[in-house]
């Protein structure tokens, strides 16, 4: 005989949590909007305005993630209840186990949707840029920056996000000096925004013939892609624009002409660059878009810093402080803000970052 009461309690709990989410996520309004968006996308002339069509497609995906999941929850809970009734009537343990397995899957799906409540920021749903910069330390630091690049690319791939290398500067011997990656997907910035900061690596260096232990640092900076109509004033006199021949990853096909563009915002020292297109004009547009996004993020960070009375250390506003330590010799990676720790270092370097990201988001960082 099997225990039916705990399963019924679980069904009731999931039903109540699902109802709470329907209200919190404004299910009715989203369902109505989804119908409107679908109708617009079915219009034959919708692709006469490609940018609007793409925006509608992205909005549809975001709406479906809520509406479809809640619809599936409702139907799934009804199906599980039906299976349980059959299992009890027939005293069939196999059917009972099938119902329990389906219930576990529904609970996991609901937990993922509940996690969206963490994404309450204005730009959490936006695509984002990730800048990785090697610290001082030459080849060792540049190799570490390359390892971080691979880690974030693997993480993005695992979440189904699209990635694009906007600019990459190769290291002198190995690794990279810097890279800018555009990451596109549902709540890309919301997921990654707490990753801004300094990442510390401790390991026996493969570049040291004596096999000595080295400590290296690389910085990550995450900022959202902002709408073109966002009100950010940039004085053209504050910008220095340089063009140069592209080289390295993302630029192999354009290195015969000075198509790469670097823009420096003189008052803040912020630099953006792009070399992934044959057209200098397109590279300049992309670099300006990044500049706008970086200045917006800087302004938001300044406001947050003021709230926390941290104006005395403005250097932390741009890059943040040390957030995570990767000690490979001891097989230990620890988040210094949340205390989350793991010994499965290879899995993390292969992109298994969710435990760290989820903990930092739940902590409200």
From Swiss-Prot:
Signal sequence interval, chain numbering: none
PTM sites of type N5-methylglutamine: 252
Molecular function in Gene Ontology: translation release factor activity, codon specific
Cellular component GO terms held in the UniProt record: cytoplasm
Disulfide bond sites: none
Keywords: Cytoplasm, Methylation, Protein biosynthesis
SMART domains: PCRF
Gene3D superfamilies: 3.30.160.20, 3.30.70.1660, Release factor (1.20.58.410)
Post-translational modification: Methylated by PrmC. Methylation increases the termination efficiency of RF2.
Localization (cell): Cytoplasm
InterPro entries: PCRF, Pep_chain_release_fac_I, Pep_chain_release_fac_I_sf, PrfB
Domain of life: Bacteria
Pfam families from the UniProt entry: PCRF (PF03462), RF-1 (PF00472)
Family: Belongs to the prokaryotic/mitochondrial release factor family.
NCBIfam families listed in its UniProt record: prfB
Protein purpose: Peptide chain release factor 2 directs the termination of translation in response to the peptide chain termination codons UGA and UAA.
Protein name according to UniProt: Peptide chain release factor 2
Species of the source: Escherichia coli O8 (strain IAI1)
Gene from which this protein is expressed: prfB
